[in-house]
UniProtKB/Swiss-Prot annotation:
Listed GO MF terms: structural constituent of ribosome
PANTHER family: LARGE RIBOSOMAL SUBUNIT PROTEIN BL17M (PTHR14413:SF16), RIBOSOMAL PROTEIN L17 (PTHR14413)
Organism field: Sinorhizobium fredii (strain NBRC 101917 / NGR234)
Classification of source organism: Bacteria, Pseudomonadati, Pseudomonadota, Alphaproteobacteria, Hyphomicrobiales
One Pfam family linked to the record: Ribosomal_L17
Protein known as: Large ribosomal subunit protein bL17
InterPro entries: Ribosomal_bL17 (IPR000456), Ribosomal_bL17_CS (IPR047859), Ribosomal_bL17_sf (IPR036373)
Sequence similarity: Belongs to the bacterial ribosomal protein bL17 family.
């Protein structure tokens, strides 16, 4: 019997789930908005909210705990520097989930999960920087 077992399995092994949530959390913190399926969005929300609370704590131990969970030092530094200061006065509720219709291939329910006071310019910033660098290199050549 499965009494008291919280969380969805999402048809994955435990290690696959852990890796997927780490990658999704890193992407969400980096871009501040991602599109995923509704069950995955509902599962990732408490993970990222706990990471933001770690960022608000701000000490070395909290930073190491965050690194051990999402395994990307650059994303953790953004979490602790930019995001933690943005939500310093807010007690929880850092994320919102909005339903976004159904996926065409398998009709899976989609959702947009984003930070409540998100930086609109953060989404795709890395790609814009790469495209600009490639354009400069093409002009110089």
């Amino acid at each position: 019997m499965r009494h008291g077992k919280a969380g969805r399995k999402l048809n994955r092994t435990a290690s696959h789930r852990k890796a997927m949530f780490a990658n999704m959390a890193a992407s969400l913190i980096e871009h501040e908005q991602i599109v995923t399926t509704l069950p995955k969005a509902k599962e990732i929300r408490p993970i990222v909210e706990k990471l933001v609370t770690l960022g608000k704590r701000g000490d070395l131990h909290a930073r190491r705990q965050a690194i051990s969970q999402i395994r990307d030092v650059a994303v953790v530094s953004k979490l602790f520097d930019a995001i933690a200061s943005r939500y310093a006065t807010r007690n929880g509720g850092y994320l919102r989930i909005m339903k976004a219709g159904f996926r065409q291939g398998d009709n899976a329910p989609l959702a947009v999960i984003e930070f409540v006071d998100r930086d609109v310019d953060a989404k795709g910033a890395k790609d814009r920087a790469r495209v600009a660098a490639e354009a400069e290199a093409a002009e110089a050549a």
